[in-house]
C-alpha cells in the first residue's frame, strides 16, 4: 500500500528570543502646546576659494582660510536644556517622572547674495589634447600640461539631523602582502565612510575621491580638490539607519554636463589588449611611417559644467515643515543638538581684487606686473527654526530603549541610582597630592567629553535665541498660518455679523367666519 510522505528538509525554527522592536519617538514622546522660535544672526565667512593662504615664515599659520562654494558647511546648533527652563506653570510636567526634549517642526535656510558661477582650474592641468575635435595625431613630450579652468557641477543640498551626516569617498586601500605590489602598480581602492565636517569638499564632477593620495601627478584635478578629499553623503547608509538621527530629511538638486573631452598624458598603466599582435579585436595597426604607428594615450576624461543657474530652481530661502521624518526619530533633538549640513555653489561668485604695487601715478601706462591680483569668496547664511516642547516619560521600557539607543541621553539627564547610606565611618585624607599620602582609591570624576571634539563644525549657540512669541518672527507667522494655531490654541473665534441679527416680527391672524 502506497502512502504520501512530506518532503524531508530543514525546519525553520524561530529565534530563541524575540527580535527587539525599535520604537518610534511618537509612540512614547508626548507633544505639548508650547512652540518656540529660534533664529541666528547673519553668518558670514570670507576666504580664498582654492586653498588656504599660509605664512611663509610659519607654514602652519593660516593667514586666509579656504572658503569655497563647493565646500560643505556643517552647522552645529547648541539648543538650551528645556529641563532648566523657568516655566510659569510649575505643574506643567513632573521632573521626577518626565523629561523635556525639543522636536523640530520647521526650518528655513536663508542664503544671501546674488546668484553666481565661480570657476576653478589648474595652471598645470594634465591635458594632452582635445579629443572632441582633434586636428592632428599629436605626439607626447615630457610635459604637455596646460592652464585649464572650468565651472564645477551645480549642487544644492541640505541634510537635517541631530547627529553629523555620514559621508563616503573612495580611498587607497592596503594591498595584499602576497604577491607583493611592484613600484608603479595601481593600488587597490576601497569605500570609506566618515563624518562630513565643515570645510570638506563636495563632489564637483570628478567623483568622491581622495585626490591627495591617488593622484601623484598633482595635475589631474582643479586646485581646490587636488590636495584634499571630495566627499558625498552616504544616503544609502543614513537612509537605512533604523533610528535616523543623522537624517531627518534632506533636499538635493544636482546638474551638470560634459563640456570638454580631453585625454591624459603619461604612460598607460593598463595597456590595450593585444597591442602588438598581428590581429586585434580593438584596432588595426598603422604603417611604420605614419604618426598613428605609436599609439596615443587612451585615458579619456571630460570636464564638468554646471550650466545655467536660475532662481526658479533654488532649494533655499523657503520654509520646510517636518511632519514625518524618514526614520523612527521624528525630529527629536537628542542631547539638545541639531546639525545642518549643506552645500550650495549657485551663489559661487569669486571676487577678484587688484591692488597697485608699483609704478608712478603721473602719466602712468598700464603694466600688468604693477598690479597684484587677489581672489576672495564669501558665504552668507541665516537660519530660522520652529521647535515644539515634548515630554518623555521615565518608564522602565522607555529608559531601556534609550539606553540601548544612546546611553549618553540618560547620562545627560543625570539619572543615577541613589547610593545607600554609609554603614560606618570612612577615612578622608587632606593632602591627596602629597607624596606622604597614599594614592586616592578613586579618581575624581572628570568633565564629560564631547563625542565630536575632534571634528570641525561651525558651532552656533542658540541657548539665548528662543522665543515663544511666534507672531513676532517671519517663520513663526507662517507656521501659525499653516498649522491654524492662534494664541497657542487650535480654536478659532467665530465672528457674527450684525446684519444677521434676529428681529421680532408680528404676524396678523385672521378670524375664521362661523357658518350659520
From Swiss-Prot:
Top-rank lineage group of the source organism: Viruses
Keywords attached to this entry: Capsid protein, Disulfide bond, Host nucleus, Host-virus interaction, Late protein, T=7 icosahedral capsid protein, Viral attachment to host cell, Viral penetration into host cytoplasm, Virion, Virus endocytosis by host, Virus entry into host cell
GO cellular component terms, semicolon-separated: host cell nucleus; T=7 icosahedral viral capsid
Principal location listed in the UniProt entry: virion
Leader peptide range in chain numbering: none
BP terms from Gene Ontology: endocytosis involved in viral entry into host cell; virion attachment to host cell
Single GO MF descriptor: structural molecule activity
Region (Disordered): 129-148, 497-516
Pfam name, any one: Late_protein_L1
UniProt biased composition (Basic residues): 507-516
Compartment list: Virion; Host nucleus
InterPro entries, alphabetized: Capsid_L1_Papillomavir, Capsid_L1_sf_Papillomavir, dsDNA_vir_gr_I_capsid
Membrane-spanning intervals of the chain: none
Compositional bias annotation for Basic and acidic residues: 139-148
Comp. bias intervals (Polar residues): 497-506
The protein's assembly and partners: Self-assembles into homopentamers. The capsid has an icosahedral symmetry and consists of 72 capsomers, with each capsomer being a pentamer of L1. Interacts with the minor capsid protein L2; this interaction is necessary for viral genome encapsidation. Interacts with protein E2; this interaction enhances E2-dependent replication and transcription activation.
Described function: Forms an icosahedral capsid with a T=7 symmetry and a 50 nm diameter. The capsid is composed of 72 pentamers linked to each other by disulfide bonds and associated with L2 proteins. Binds to heparan sulfate proteoglycans on cell surface of basal layer keratinocytes to provide initial virion attachment. This binding mediates a conformational change in the virus capsid that facilitates efficient infection. The virion enters the host cell via endocytosis. During virus trafficking, L1 protein dissociates from the viral DNA and the genomic DNA is released to the host nucleus.
Family: Belongs to the papillomaviridae L1 protein family.
UniProt name for this protein: Major capsid protein L1
Gene (UniProt): L1
Amino acid at each position: 500500500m502506497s502512502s504520501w510522505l512530506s518532503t524531508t528538509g530543514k525546519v525553520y525554527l524561530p529565534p530563541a528570543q524575540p527580535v527587539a522592536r525599535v520604537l518610534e519617538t511618537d509612540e512614547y514622546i508626548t507633544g505639548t502646546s508650547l512652540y518656540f522660535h529660534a533664529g541666528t544672526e547673519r553668518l558670514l565667512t570670507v576666504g580664498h576659494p582654492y586653498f588656504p593662504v599660509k605664512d611663509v615664515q610659519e607654514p602652519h599659520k593660516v593667514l586666509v582660510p579656504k572658503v569655497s562654494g563647493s565646500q560643505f558647511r556643517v552647522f552645529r546648533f547648541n539648543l538650551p536644556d528645556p529641563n532648566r527652563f523657568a516655566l510659569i506653570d510649575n505643574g506643567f510636567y513632573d521632573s521626577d517622572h518626565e523629561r523635556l526634549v525639543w522636536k523640530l517642526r520647521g526650518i528655513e535656510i536663508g542664503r544671501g547674495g546674488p546668484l553666481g558661477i565661480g570657476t576653478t582650474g589648474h595652471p598645470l592641468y594634465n591635458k594632452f589634447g582635445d579629443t572632441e575635435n582633434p586636428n592632428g595625431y599629436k605626439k607626447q613630450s615630457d610635459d604637455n600640461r596646460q592652464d585649464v579652468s572650468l565651472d564645477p557641477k551645480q549642487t544644492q543640498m541640505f541634510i537635517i539631523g541631530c547627529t553629523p551626516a555620514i559621508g563616503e569617498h573612495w580611498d587607497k586601500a592596503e594591498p595584499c602582502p602576497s604577491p607583493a605590489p611592484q613600484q608603479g602598480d595601481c593600488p587597490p581602492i576601497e569605500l570609506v565612510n566618515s563624518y562630513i565636517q565643515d570645510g570638506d569638499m563636495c563632489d564637483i564632477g570628478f567623483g568622491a575621491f581622495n585626490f591627495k593620495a591617488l593622484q601623484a601627478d598633482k595635475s589631474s584635478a582643479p586646485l581646490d580638490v587636488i590636495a584634499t578629499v571630495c566627499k558625498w553623503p552616504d544616503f544609502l547608509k543614513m537612509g537605512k539607519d533604523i533610528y535616523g538621527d543623522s537624517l531627518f530629511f534632506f533636499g538635493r538638486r544636482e546638474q551638470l554636463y560634459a563640456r570638454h573631452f580631453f585625454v591624459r598624458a603619461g604612460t598607460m598603466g593598463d595597456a590595450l589588449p593585444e597591442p602588438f599582435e598581428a590581429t586585434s579585436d580593438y584596432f588595426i595597426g598603422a604603417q611604420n611611417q605614419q604618426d598613428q604607428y605609436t599609439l596615443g594615450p587612451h585615458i579619456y576624461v571630460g570636464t564638468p559644467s554646471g550650466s545655467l543657474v536660475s532662481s526658479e530652481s533654488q532649494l533655499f530661502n523657503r520654509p520646510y515643515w517636518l511632519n514625518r521624518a524618514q526614520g523612527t526619530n521624528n525630529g527629536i533633538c537628542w542631547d539638545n543638538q541639531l546639525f545642518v549640513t549643506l552645500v550650495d555653489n549657485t551663489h559661487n561668485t569669486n571676487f577678484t581684487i587688484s591692488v597697485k604695487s608699483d609704478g608712478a601715478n603721473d602719466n602712468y601706462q598700464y603694466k600688468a606686473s604693477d598690479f597684484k591680483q587677489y581672489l576672495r569668496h564669501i558665504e552668507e547664511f541665516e537660519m530660522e527654526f520652529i521647535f515644539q516642547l515634548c515630554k518623555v516619560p521615565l518608564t522602565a521600557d522607555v529608559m531601556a530603549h534609550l539606553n540601548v539607543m544612546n546611553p549618553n541621553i540618560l547620562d545627560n539627564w543625570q539619572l543615577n541610582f541613589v547610593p545607600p547610606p554609609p554603614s560606618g565611618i570612612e577615612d578622608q585624607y587632606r593632602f591627596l597630592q602629597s607624596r606622604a599620602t597614599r594614592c586616592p582609591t578613586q579618581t575624581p570624576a572628570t568633565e564629560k567629553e564631547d563625542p565630536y571634539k575632534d571634528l570641525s563644525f561651525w558651532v552656533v549657540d542658540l541657548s539665548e535665541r528662543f522665543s515663544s512669541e511666534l507672531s513676532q518672527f517671519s517663520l513663526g507667522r507662517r507656521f501659525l498660518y499653516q498649522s491654524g494655531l492662534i494664541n497657542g490654541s487650535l480654536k478659532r473665534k467665530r465672528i457674527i455679523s450684525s446684519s444677521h441679527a434676529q428681529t421680532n416680527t408680528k404676524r396678523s391672524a385672521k378670524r375664521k367666519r362661523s357658518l350659520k
